[in-house]
């Protein structure tokens, strides 16, 4: 009976996940504008910072755990806020697991994992080239506009500031006009200008 309850709970979860994925695909197809929503709390481990591969033994072991223990692991792009503040658009890559799945799949945090807290964010689907060769051909400012340009415009219009690292989750890959592309759900954590000034 207990096993049956577990299976029912998991099937219910899968149903909700599929429903969420379908909504994301519909948004990607329509390229619906950005919207405000709290991001999902997740734990990630990076394998690349800018052009530098991160290869510490403990980090590689944790990446292996993420990839092989969680069927719901997500490939992410991360843009650190501190890099943006220095005028750089540095893209980091990693693997992420939703907070709720860490215990479910007996996974642990360590010095190589980072907790990405739930907070108010501006979200939107963006399309970028799927190959590193093509991505590396873009100027930083062009890439910034491609990935978060609509987010920044919305923030400007609504008097908001960036309030943390920006995260993008790959939601789908496709070939369009003979070229591989990726659709990412980009989340930019925000705070109002007024709140920022108080802090």
Language model features: what each stretch is:
Residues 2-199:
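A solvent-exposed interaction/effector surface
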